[in-house]
Amino acid sequence: MRCMFSGCSSLKYLNLSNFNTRNVECFGNMFHRCSSLTSLNLSSFDTHKVKNMGGMFKRCSSLKSLDLSNFDTKNVESMCEMFGECSSLTSLNISNFDTRKVDRVEDMFIKCHSLKTENIIVSDDRILAELNSFSRHFKKIEDECNII
């Protein structure tokens, strides 16, 4: 599914509820440059075999929120620029992300200027470190923020 919708700049909404992603290993750049995409429901995605999520949502500049709490990322090796340049993204749930096998997280949140600490849910220390590489305001929930 690499680059499947890449460059679909007029695309505003997608219904992917019937997509069978059970055997997919690469979501790299899947929605790259879908600059008009405002919402995306990926709750039916089976991601247990995925190894590459690099650039998956890169330059989705109209996307405001994403709930990826259902994503199984235990086999993912690359998340570089996954949300890069998602300049309107204000809310993100990646609470179940597991980055133990990930070797590339650089620029995961580069130019995500609208992303606020109170609207991101994360539980992984490596992702927290990447968040802090562009903003020092992110903390874990035990430090009294909504990031877990």
What are the residue ranges of the model-derived segments?
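Negatively charged
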Residues: M1-I148
